Amino acid sequence: MAATNEVIPTSENPSDVSGSSQKLATEETALANGVDHEEEDSGEAGGEVFQLTVVLPREPHKIPIIVSSQEAIHDVRQSIIELPGTFQYSCFHLEHKGERINDFVQISEVPGLTADSEIHLVEDPYTEKEARIHIVRVRELIGAAGDRTDTLNGIISGVSLLDSVTSAESTQNGTSTAPSHPMVGFDFQASGTLSTLLPKAQEPGPKTIKSISVSPWNPPPYHLRQKGHLLYLQVTTNEGEQFQITSHVSGFYVNKSSTGKFDPSPKSAPKAHSAHSLLALLGDLSPSFEDSFKRLQEYNNTKEPLATFQITNATPSNPWIVPSASAPLVAHQADITRTQENYLIAGIENSETLRDWNEEFQSTRELPKETVQDRVFRERLTSKLFADYNDAAARGAILVARGEIAPLNPTEGKDAQIFVYNNVFFSFGADGVGTFASEGGDEAARAAVGKDVMGVRMVNQLDIDGLFTPGTVVVDYLGKRIVGQSIVPGIFKQRDPGENQIDYGAVDGKDIVASDEKFVSVFEKLSKALKVKKHAVWDKDGKRHDLEGSIETKGLLGTDGRKYVLDLYRVTPLDITWMEEVGTALDSPKEADVASESAYPHRMTVIRPELVEAYWKVKMREWVNGELERKRQAQKTIEPTAEEKEPGAVAEASEASKSDEPTENGELAKKADESDKDAEPSKPAADQERIDIGDFKFALNPDAFSGQQPQTDEEKAEFAEDEQQVRLVCEFLRKTVLPELVNDLKEGDVGFPMDGQSLSRLLHKRGINIRYLGQVATLADGKRLESLRILAVQEMVSRAFKHVAGNYLRYLPIPLTSSCIAHLLNCLLGTDLNATPKPDVDEAMAALYPDADLKFKEVSPESLKRDIEAQILRRFRYTLDSTWTAAIKHLQLLREVSLKLGIQLEMKPYHFTKQSQTEAAAAPPTTNGEATKDAAPTGKSTNGKKKKKNAREGSPASITSVNASSPVTFNPDDILNTVPVIKEASPRSSLAEEALEAGRISLLQDQKKLGQELLLESLSLHEQIYGILHPEVARVYNSLSMLYYQLDEKEAAMELARKAVIVSERTLGVDNAETLLNYLNLGLIAHASGETKLALTYIKHALDLWKVVYGPNHPDSITTINNAAVMLQHLKEYHDSRTWFEASLKICEEVYGKHSINAATLLFQLAQALALDQDSKSAVNRMRESYNIFLTELGAEDKNTKEAEKWLEQLTQNAVSIAKHAKDVQARRNRAGIRVSPRVTLGQTQLQPQVGQTAEAAAGRDSRSSRGLDSRSIDELLKFIEGSDQANKNKKRPGRSNPKRRGGAAAAAGK
């Protein structure tokens, strides 16, 4: 919880929300525990904020602390522990007027405790646990704690680069030879630099003591335990003195022991030292301690706090490129206490870490959720619990994969073995016992457990009373898929003869069907939410059973009396169109098994829930419109205006409302706040227009096409109808959803994916399964969609490689996996350097494993190529070109493969071609700092942070293999680590999302004050529920920073954007697509706040990331480069600005063609830039080109055409005038020295939408209000050049159309 105290935009928050601003300001020192701004509670009870004084036993004797009446005393304690003036206290209680205050009551419940009251901090006697916690804490505070032994998270997990990026800018500014701006010499076409992904080397912090550890005399003998001895410590100060310290119930004191003699009694005066806090005792023992501790705090204060907090509620991101093992950042240091930390944290019995996960999950779910307070507490607990469980399950899964845990059934085959560790039940995601024999065996089992996690997450999100799910995690590690589940009470119970193991759904395959009535009510609620139809199934005897859910979805009545739902891999129907196409829709399982090699690997091809939701919305809209039309016909008397108003409202409500569910009485009611205002004047009309959506019926049968045998004609007819309904949804996917997505990307209407992960997320959001990547690649036809085709092919290749590599890695002993991975990577990516790579296997190591399957040694580039092509044909129905290996982007494919397999590679120059290796060999040693396959671009000087390290490590072994005559790209030593890839089922916070949505709606309705209060409330809820370091919090920081940017709250926007960057770096990855977009938005906001050089630094870093993630010339980089050009104009760097506009235009012409509307828009801007650069002739030519395109594409009457024509005339007339005025510019600029206000930009920067988001949505605008070209006249341009436009700086200018909306949008703007 420590992290949650450092929250947030303080005084920079909007002044008109004083209460919320004050609340946020105070959260630096106090964690607001669920302050409730809802109207249902009284304003005062909503969380009154006031100041208390804490009286301390020693200096500074008193400290003020800001608290909220809703806070628990426990949170106040935590705040005191975190404050710099009081962090030596950890074992204490609080008293008010001599009465001890219970830690678990709220401040408002303490009698007589009001503003300016005094509470006393009273030190408690230590217990052994408190003493251990105190010691761990002091070690961390004084910088004596090394890195913890971590078996789960990889090298530099959770790293942030923002400090490095920002410091690069400030260092450059501080030098006399600093370039005039960060973009000097930037090379647009250079390949990516791996060092972009690593932080700069930092100076180590000052040392406060040499060492502190548990003494060899620990633990105390029995007779001394009786006297209050808890632990013995050993401390060596910076002065070199060694002290033996006793941890006693009364505190800490120096004892008489030495390394050879045991005497834990206190030393006598003058050497006697004792204190309640170990921190205070260390200050007494070491003369230099106070000074070095102060310097350490100053050193820590230079770092961004968010970058140093421990990540507790999310999985830290694991970078795929990491420093070499000997780099200072990760060098292994001797630390005796590293091995003792588990004991210090968990105690001698280690029992404190064992938890009953299932009971915790279910009892948390049973917590009340009536009030907002209840919901905050419940969701906060849920979030932490899922994070803890995911962590424990992933750690256990790695131990299972490494063979460290004994199976419960050692006589069974490997894939059928099950394990229990740390109260988590583990099994392999393979078909060990033949359950999926007819569905595709191991492949089907692997797919099923992945789908199961998704199903469990959906059920967790729905939060249905009385229905419980086990904790579920799937871990992929070195080719193995391992499922970790919390142990459901009764799942292992031996049932009596004739009694089923399962109470609802299929038992033992589908031969027996159980349908216990107790499950009907909860499964009915689940099915309604998931659009699942109640339907008949038949057992092996042909007996009919009516089930609420799929036959595969099972209900189990636990011995704890709770109803559990299991096996949620089939909550949606099978994709029959796909199955018929790929040969898996065969009636006979045996036929399917012996189907050709090209058949899809399994029959678990279900449609996505997002597709069902999208289809439901379409059907609902059709039905609503039909009903309205019917009512109109029936009620001719109602005024036409009232009639025409309603359909939009209903259709919008059905689309915009997140939970398109009917209200209690089954009516599609408007949101309360809207209906209060809107529905009041015309209640009778509204009542007549209201439609009862309870009459709308839509549900799908998930067991359609799954081999059910209806018995009667009536049953057959109904089943045929169910199957037809499923077919329509499958057709909707192919005929509507896929083409729409491709068209949106073609028109530039939405943010473009930049890597496999963002492409997958976009497909999933639209309800498209990954198996349709082949169709996406086929539909991505033409120059405009070339980027999409390249991405889709790259993603298919990386996924196929993952499957091929998994087959070789699955049963390979761990010490041989690096050789396997390196060889497979050489066969995939290193063939230009060495066409016949040989595996580098340590034969002595291999000899230790005589049974190991070393078939990877036989893999050649040709065989791997064939395997990948076959996998892509089977899984994606796509045939690669014969030249695909020549077309792959080496660096980007290496990144995709590493992320999918969890590989962490050493940061060094990887040579993919002979040319790059020759260049590197010929280069002087000093250039060894840049980790790319090409020479470093000139603009990359700031990234040479690894120079020293690489120069030191530039041995031939780091580039070539053992056999120097045949160099290879990758060696086994380059694979420093592999980390697990985790799929988990934690739900999102519905409460925090509701507040965010309500805030957005209020802003759209122009209720600015209410909107901002709700947004702040949502921010507070996100932080309380998730903790600060969580991907959802990064997303809300980013959304709010954009909204504040729109509201002109620049400081608050800047603070939130910085936090968004750090949190997404640490939880999603330093090169994740969301992180990159967060950097771009931070750049925009920094520019708007007047820090244009810093903004360009952020944008340069984002472009450097882009080169690694995608390569040059990404369609969305048109906007980014354009924004950078506008910023350079602000810095009066007119010539450089012009080259950036030209670069943007070049990419635009490549992607959209020379005669596209987007090209015309950019030509228009470039002409202005050329005019500023005093190149009047080129300016006139470019404006003429722009005018001609607008004229051809939009016609003479279009406002864009007219605008361009006006500019063209004036540019031609005033060419002479510009030349004349240009002479005065420098003198005037030097005299004035005024920074141009961002409001009077000639060009305007554009917001960067998230992948799949429209530009309008990113800007918080209505899509209907697209903007036209810059309407300023040439005279204003002249004034701008001369710096005389300052007088008008408060006058808002209409913006130019957004080049981000490539194509259709610009056209729309002009119509």
From Swiss-Prot:
Keywords on record: Cytoplasm, Repeat, TPR repeat
Membrane spanning stretches: none
Keyword Repeat in annotation: yes
UniProt biased composition (Basic and acidic residues): 655-691, 1259-1279
Residue span of region Disordered: 1-46, 629-691, 915-965, 1236-1311
Positions annotated as TPR repeat: 1034-1067, 1076-1109, 1118-1151
Sequence ranges of Polar residues compositional bias: 7-24, 915-930, 1242-1253
PROSITE patterns membership: CLU, TPR, TPR_REGION
The UniProt record lists the keyword Transcription: no
CDD domains, alphabetized: CLU-central
Subcellular localization: Cytoplasm
UniProt-listed Gene3D superfamilies: Hypothetical protein (hspc210) (3.30.2280.10), Tetratricopeptide repeat domain (1.25.40.10)
Domain Clu positions: 335-579
GO biological process: intracellular distribution of mitochondria; mitochondrion organization
GO MF term list: mRNA binding
GO CC terms: cytoplasm
Main location: cytoplasm
Source superkingdom: Eukaryota
Compositional bias of kind Basic residues: 1289-1303
Similarity section: Belongs to the CLU family.
Function: mRNA-binding protein involved in proper cytoplasmic distribution of mitochondria.
Quaternary organization: May associate with the eukaryotic translation initiation factor 3 (eIF-3) complex.
Protein name in UniProt: Clustered mitochondria protein homolog
Species of the source: Sclerotinia sclerotiorum (strain ATCC 18683 / 1980 / Ss-1)
Gene designation: clu1
